[in-house]
């Protein structure tokens, strides 16, 4: 009986040690593509485990050049995150005044990359941006407000300029 039990235990131990070798990353860091016309999710293995440590680690990744030359960091060199605050599920990020020097398209992509990256952290559902201690406004002076990952439409492929024609029969 002891031998059968020991063999069964060893078999279970061997099965536990086996895996398919494919470990997927729990997180993605969103980078800009080479042309700065879209964002690309790149798998990322975080070393941090706490919420605050993950926030800091993601800020560092978003501000650093990626390993792949096909991607660009979303937060430019001259833009600095001065502080952040976490109030429930809302992460508020404070940038210095240099944030306003970004081109319009790059700024929107930066926001999308930061928001989509940060909302992957458990407990963070939305993000708000402040620039020079004031809420971020768009080109029309309207406050941008709270942003969610779903606030940014993903555009698969090159469909932004595509036009389709069709003939319809109306009755």
Where in this protein do the model-derived segments appear?
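Bimodal "functional hotspot" detector
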Residues: 3-7, 13, 18-171
């Amino acid at each position: 009986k002891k031998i059968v039990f020991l063999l069964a235990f060893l078999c279970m131990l061997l099965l536990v040690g086996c895996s398919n070798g494919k470990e997927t990353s729990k997180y993605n860091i969103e980078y800009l593509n080479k042309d700065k016309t879209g964002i690309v999710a790149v798998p990322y293995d975080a070393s941090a485990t706490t919420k605050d440590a993950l926030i800091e680690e993601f800020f560092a990744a978003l501000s650093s050049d990626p390993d792949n030359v096909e991607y660009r960091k979303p937060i430019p060199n001259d833009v600095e995150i001065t502080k952040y605050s976490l109030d429930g599920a809302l992460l508020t990020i404070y940038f210095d005044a240099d944030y306003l020097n970004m081109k319009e398209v790059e700024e929107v992509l930066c926001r999308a990359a930061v928001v989509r990256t940060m909302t992957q952290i458990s407990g963070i559902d939305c993000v708000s941006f402040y620039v020079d201690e004031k809420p971020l406004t768009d080109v029309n002076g309207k406050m941008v407000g709270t942003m969610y990952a779903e606030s940014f439409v993903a555009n698969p492929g090159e469909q932004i300029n595509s036009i389709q024609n069709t003939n319809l029969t109306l009755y």
